[in-house]
UniProtKB/Swiss-Prot annotation:
HAMAP family: Cas2 (MF_01471). GO terms for molecular function: metal ion binding; RNA endonuclease activity. It comes from Pyrobaculum aerophilum (strain ATCC 51768 / DSM 7523 / JCM 9630 / CIP 104966 / NBRC 100827 / IM2). The keyword DNA-binding does not apply. This is CRISPR-associated endoribonuclease Cas2 1. CRISPR (clustered regularly interspaced short palindromic repeat), is an adaptive immune system that provides protection against mobile genetic elements (viruses, transposable elements and conjugative plasmids). CRISPR clusters contain sequences complementary to antecedent mobile elements and target invading nucleic acids. CRISPR clusters are transcribed and processed into CRISPR RNA (crRNA). Functions as a ssRNA-specific endoribonuclease. Involved in the integration of spacer DNA into the CRISPR cassette.
Amino acid sequence: MIWLAVYDIEDDGERAKASAILQAWGFVRVQRSFYVGRMPRGKAADLLKILQRHVKSGHIALIPITDELLAKALELGRPPYAPLKPPKYAQIYVV
């Protein structure tokens, strides 16, 4: 399953730690506080527990999304998470 990880963390140290943890777990940064990764639901729950130990301020959400829904995303440009797309993914270009 694909997971979107988003956060709003005020503390700089906690924010840096959350970023490092997400990237260590294979998540790819899309924007400053938005990551995407692939893992089973049980592993995502484990990840959230680890994040909970290190982040005391702000909010973190792990949002599941299916391959089918990601394939329907409307995008412009090449996203950094393209390898997570199912093989049938067709890039949409707006002219």
